[in-house]
A protein has these predicted regions:
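Sec-dependent N-terminal signal peptides
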Residues: 6-12
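C-terminal motif of bacterial Sec signal peptides marking the signal peptidase cleavage site
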Residues: 16-19
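Short structured motifs
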Residues: 52, 68, 100-102, 114-120, ...
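Surface-exposed, charged secondary-structure patches
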Residues: 104-146
C-alpha cells in the first residue's frame, strides 16, 4: 500500500508539472545558452509577493488571463482535446505529442482538481507572458482511492501563437508544509 501511495504522489507531482517536459530530452547548445542568458522564469518564485507586470496592454491582459483560466478549466474538466487547445504546437518545455499521451493517461488514472489564487501576470512581452499563481491540488487515484492534497506556486509561460496565447512551459514549486496523502 505504501508503494502505491508513493507512486500516486510521484505521478501527481509529475503531472503538476504537466507541461514541463521530458528531462531526458537533449537541448541544443544555442537553446541551453538562451535559457541561461534569459533565465528560467523572469522573476523570483520564492518569497512573499509577486508584482504585477506594469507594461501589459489591457487587451493582452484580458486575453492572457482568459487563456490561463481556460487552461486550468480544461485540466479540471479532464477534457483532453480542450486541454490540448491551450497548449502551444511548438512548446519550449515539452513535446506536444508526448504531452497529449501523458495527459490522457493521467486523466484516466486520476481525478485532479486545481484551485488557483493570486493569479498575476508577472512578466510580459508582446510575444510571451509569465503568469504566476498559488495553486492547491486535490487528487484521487482512481484505482486505489488514495487522496492527495498539495499546494505550491506555479508559473505558466504563454506564447502568442496564431493570435492566441498558448502554454509553452510550466514551472512549479511545491510547498510540502501544505501537502498530505491519505485514504
Amino acid at each position: 500500500m505504501l508503494k502505491k501511495s508513493f507512486l500516486a504522489v510521484l505521478i501527481l507531482f509529475v503531472f503538476t508539472l504537466a507541461a514541463c517536459g521530458n528531462k531526458e530530452e537533449k537541448i541544443s547548445d544555442d537553446d541551453r545558452e538562451k535559457v541561461i542568458e534569459d533565465g528560467t522564469v523572469g522573476f523570483e518564485m520564492m518569497g512573499g509577493n509577486v508584482e504585477k507586470a506594469e507594461n501589459v496592454p489591457e487587451a493582452d491582459e484580458k486575453a492572457i488571463l482568459a487563456s490561463f483560466d481556460e487552461y486550468i478549466a480544461a485540466l479540471n474538466a479532464e477534457e483532453i482535446d480542450r486541454y490540448m487547445k491551450t497548449i502551444s504546437k511548438n512548446p519550449k518545455g515539452f513535446k506536444y505529442d508526448e504531452e497529449k499521451t501523458y495527459a490522457t493517461e493521467v486523466f484516466d488514472q486520476f481525478d485532479i482538481k486545481r484551485d488557483v489564487e493570486n493569479v498575476t501576470i508577472a512578466k510580459y512581452a508582446p510575444e510571451e507572458a509569465q503568469v504566476f499563481a498559488n495553486m492547491k491540488m486535490h487528487s484521487l487515484q482512481l484505482e486505489t482511492n488514495v487522496e492527495h492534497e498539495s499546494a505550491g506556486r506555479q508559473v505558466t509561460v504563454f506564447v502568442k501563437e496564431d493570435d492566441a496565447w498558448k502554454v509553452t512551459s510550466v514551472f512549479y514549486i511545491g510547498d510540502d508544509s501544505q501537502s498530505s496523502t491519505g485514504n
